[in-house]
Amino acid sequence: MQCYTELLPPTGVTHSLSIPFLSATATNLVVVKTSVLQIFSLLNVSCSAEGEIIAAKSARPDQLQSTKLILEREYSLSGTVSDLCRVKLLKTKSGGDAILLAFRNAKLSLVEWDPERYGISTISIHYYERDDITRSPWVPDLSSCGSILSVDPSSRCAVFNFGIRNLAILPFHQPGDDLVMGDYESDSQKQSHEHEMDDSAGNSKSKEGAVHQTPYASSFVLPLTALDSAILHPVSLAFLYEYREPTFGILYSQIATSNSLLHERKDAIFYTVFTLDLEQRASTMLLSVTRLPSDLFKVVALPPPVGGALLIGYNELVHVDQAGKTNAVGVNEFSRQVSTFSMADQSELALRLEGCVVELLGNSSGDLLLALSSGTMVLVHFKLDGRSVSGISIRPLPGHAGGNILKAAASASASLGSDKVFFGSEDAESVLLGWSLSSSNARKSRSESKRIEKDHEEGSDDSESEEDVYEDDLYSAAPDTPALGHRLSVAPSTFASYKFKVHDVLPNTAPLRDIALGQPAMPVEDTGSHLDNICSELELVAAYGSNGNGGLVVMKRELEPVVKASLNVGPIHGVWTASIALGSAAKPMSGDQTNIEEWRQYVILTKPQTIDKEESEVFIVDGLNLKPFKAPEFNPNNDISIQVGTLSNRKRVVQVLRNEVRSYDSDLELAQIYPVWDEDTSDERMALSASLADPYIAILRDDSTLLLLQADDSGDLDELDMSDILGNEKWLSCCLYWDTTHIFSPRGHASQQSTDCGLLLFLLSTDCRLFIYRLPEQQLMSVIEGVDCLPPILSTELPKRSTTREILSEAIVANLGDSWNPLPHLILRTDNDDLVIYKPFISSVEEDGDPHCLRFVKETNHVLPRIPPDSDTNISDKEPSNHRPLCILPDISGYSAVFMPGTSASFIFKTSRSCPHILRLRGGVVRSLSDFDFTDPSLGRGFIYVDSKDVVRICQLPPETIYDYSWTLKKVAIGEHVDHLAYSISSETYVLGTSHSADFKLPEDDELHPEWRNEAISFLPELRQCCLKVVHPKTWTVIDSYTLGPDEEIMAVKNMNLEVSENTHERKNMIVVGTALARGEDIPARGCIYVFEVIKVVPDPEKPETDRKLKLIGKELVKGAVTALSEIGGQGFLIAAQGQKCMVRGLKEDGSLLPVAFMDVQCYVNVLKELKGTGMCIVGDAFKGIWFAGYSEEPYKMSLFGKDLEYPEVVAADFLPDGDKLFILVADSDCNLHVLQYEPEDPMSSNGDKLLVRSKFHMGHFTSTLTLLPRTTASYEIPSADSDSMEVDPRITPQQVLITSQSGSIGIVTSIPEESYRRLSALQSQLANTVEHPCGLNPRAYRAIESDGTAGRGMLDGNLLYQWLSMSKQRRMEIAARVGAHEWEIKADLEAVGGDGLGYL
């Protein structure tokens, strides 16, 4: 019984789309990362000449402009997206366009943006999984077939090619259409198993007045042979521009193309254009072009002024216009050999077009930008003569113009406006590029654009006036008038001078190829001896990327700050900082533009004395040192400090105590005392919490009343007269916030003061209503109801079902995100330290000043708070029991964040490319934290905190780190393709197996092939040149390398503890490398096993980390490629898969490897692992499934125990012991995870010869590694000291399996006990049926859980289970009641199946 949970989402971009989605005038970028849908907006920002972004309030009009991507919403989909297109409907909720998504297994989903919910809404979902269509003995399964989705440019219909030869056509209602299919439904259509959800905004109405219940008409499925009987092998299709009826072009062949049969099947591709009659469900062939090159693989429709279609092949580009005229150009010397098709010769370019991505540059010339698989960018220009294309010219983009921006192949592209283009990649970072023309070309382009717009308007008028005359024309609505002909002749005869620059990037760690666990290197800075609990025991390092983008990524489960200084001054309860101005000028909010001597920063540490007394100790910051500062007037009564801050433009230090508010000058001399008690009634009052925002202080007292103070120009505080509601209402929490975005303000008020910031007061009443007031006029802006119900949407309306409510302890509004674009968020803290994050948005724009338009949408948070252990609950008897409030950090290393102190110490982070998420701080309990200004401008702004061990640390965030996820990621560029990775324990370094591309030329000295000497070829093939590299983890630089032969490829790199002496039986940690020497399919492959030791040498004095070097200890040439390696047994031997044998070998003193045992295997062994210390191993074959074998040492023998008779194509595998049960996890090539069990006592296993299949689980990602890891105890599982907990056998260590994938995602499989499995299984069933899933997909069908029907149990989906945490309090309790469990039991189970079991990372 296991559960699969995704710890990190996929990062590689597979699809992208430019669309006005959030509104009719918006420019949005929709990005798909395998099964994650992200919606971005574009934001123009100012930047300096060095590229540093400048905050909006500090920007000047003369500064450079850049465009950034801002993530609006993100969705995890229960399906693998295969394509997506833009559809313009008659009516949508937002007024923008809709998105049509195609999924694996023939599904289509139509979604729109819902501004009332600030998210996507599913209009319909269409299934095309009919058995009579997809089931055929000679047709592959749907999961093995690709699909093609294309939408007509006028959005009249969409075509979906699935299952090789099936074509689904989905019509859409448009203004002026003459479809009469609304009520028509044939018998075949009734059986199409199409499910269409009527969740759209209402009925759609065309200009003719016909009312449609849905924005689409009934779809139908046709075989491609119904269009033409010759379409047997479709290649690509796309809808074309400038046709009156929906018209698409399709590439196909009558026979399968083959490079090996090129001399017989040369020029076998056809290109045919069909027009569709949606009313009659018929098609008409308009033109056909025959005998095209056989390597064509893609159709790209071109808009005006070029028009027609561009056909892309491996070696050439072919343009076909609307009349069937062709123009072609060859881009390498093989174009003449593979085809006799007439084409221009540009073979000197030597381009490889396989896997290229093409995008239109948004100007009037019709130029295209090609991104090649190597990352090189190429410009394609069409020579136009009227409406006719007279030629194609190609030019690589030079490096100085941005031609080397892309580091690897692009997988998707989207044109964003007139000067921006986006390229997504699965192998490198996705980039948003901006381009510009040279000054002369820019002036010419602007003049041409104006003339085109003018002529286009004239042409449109002509077309409208003569519409009836040309109604039977299949092409554009107007004939080729001289004006239009002149309009299309706009392309210059020469290339424009383009220059590209990077606006923004989306980080990517895909594909993850290999992982290793190593010990983290100690920081270089000398920070004292207080680092024991802020560094992880191990760090997870993965090899990522492809080709020149390869490198390492260091993954940390928790944030490990860079400690700049630390000290221990005894018991500390709280820490505050205050930066005070010594001169007359105020400190700038961004940048260090004034002399540092004009500012002084104090650090106040509070030491507990009794339960209601504490001592305040003041320090002054001098560099990284804290020097004691004598301030006798600072809290002389040892009262409890509630808050410390600055007012009066940072000229006054204010200390809010329990009984009074004290104001100090720059030398901390007392300036004013303001009592907290009620002066009118003389009732004694005490402050519980406070919020400061210059010039106001909001104080919440112990009787739940509010005290509002305001500082005048001189800095003196005075109480503000409050309205009746403010003064008489009982409050639970208060927060002051400067509204720079004006999202909380009425639009009329915001437009009048668009340049000013409004100060708002947020108050949470005792009945959990959120009041929003504008200061100083105390105007009530809005009242949000039912905050403690935690619904998905917070609004002025009370939730319908609100009987069950959460106990809230704090509510704040703070900025989150990059410091140049911070966005407000409402953060709620519950009584048990759960954090709930809401994002404000405007839901309606019907009436100015309407308070009902303000709403809050709930953000996803799957991080559970920790249960405090007994050692942390009683920290000190003298420590005050006041609440540790959330700490707002306006700027911490360029980010606006919020910190939660306590047992679950964590930051709430957000970047422009991510949603708000929780980042836990490494270490134990954090008692208090505050921001910290470094005197060195290069260090920026950090933070200072005190932990439960009374250690005060001054820290900053780790530089060059990605904070977009719940784990921190640090990328280390290697510059080569990294396939294999191992950690050398003895030297504490990482050994990498890398490769780079190198040209291959046939050897001229080969005696068997003397004709090779006469080969004259300049376009050489590329092979991989492999090398071993040693990387030091302190500096992450390569310190040594070992180059292999030109035809030798690294297949495995492992760190093993081998016996190095037969006499002394000494054992050492060695690096063992398995290689393959392949020189062609007609020559048997050989292999070699290398044994290296990373030895210590004298380092370079300037580079002390270069003290390690690879030393070759042994080398053994063997027959067959060495494809897998593993340590085995207890005597220091290794087992190697060499060819069709698995052989156990021992290292001799002369460096040779002596074989002692072997076992014959099947075809190609790519997985070989031992259950450490047992001799039991698994042998995974890429074609013949998994074997379970054993090795014995007396005598030396290999024995086969059992095997899987289903023969999956094994990609990765590993053991998963669970008590006395032994499971084997196998990942196949279809993204499935098989759970097998070795159970010889089961009669179904034939005495153990057959491995029992317990379940199958579809992960949706192509697996790269499976790694067995020990599991630590989660906080919910730690028994209390006084509880009567059951005894657990300490010898049984729980295990889990970490899974990495080619898409960049990381998941974990955890074994769970019977009781937890039953609870979570019932919870999963409830969630699958009750939760509204994005795009209308079915998570149960997506995971396709199967079992053997007896003792098998389906694997649980952790992603689905964690959605329970995102529900409202009422729904959570209802579902928990149906499951028959308490809320804390479900939370404990969810923590157990999450990443908390990786406590050592």
UniProtKB/Swiss-Prot annotation:
Residues 458-472 have a biased composition (Acidic residues). Residues 181-208, 444-472 are annotated as: Disordered. The keyword Nucleus applies. GO terms for molecular function: RNA binding. Keywords: mRNA processing, Nucleus, RNA-binding. One of its GO terms (cellular component) is nucleus. It comes from the Eukaryota. This is Protein cft1. It comes from Aspergillus clavatus (strain ATCC 1007 / CBS 513.65 / DSM 816 / NCTC 3887 / NRRL 1 / QM 1276 / 107).
